Amino acid sequence: MSYEDRDTYGMYKNYDEKGPGPRLMGADTLIGDDVYNQNDEDLGDIKDIMLDVNNGRIAYAVLSFGGFLGMADKLFAVPWSALTLDTVNKRFLLKVDKARLESAPGFDKDSWPNMADPTWQNTIHTYYGTTSYEDTKSSKDYVTPAHRNDESFIPQAPVGTDHVKREWD
């Protein structure tokens, strides 16, 4: 099932057509989306989306793979940056062979890892060949503590960046 099939509010019918799909999407419409690889192999579907609430970013999509009728599925936290939205086929693409996904670090539904643990994050990003968004230079480096209590101050992201970090976080 695709995000358009779950669009009960009609959010996506008139998106701006400037990108590969809607610019903003409801997280609940992504749950259940299929994930395929470049060989058109079914890798499973998205079971959950993990948000980094401190940074306002999507950190991981939790992918379910390998079970039968939802039983004995293995779960995998895939870095959001490793996924690409395929708007033609209404699914996500992950550039990983099925055999490699089968041997990826995973977990079961009753034993989730601590996804905030930097060692765990490094393992996952290394496995999928991605860089954590926390490791990329951003406007987060340009806000000083002097602005901490100034409610009128609205930090601006420098050109080429997408978010603002407060130094006191």
Segments from the language model and where they lie:
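Peripheral interaction segments used for macromolecular assembly
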Residues: 1-169
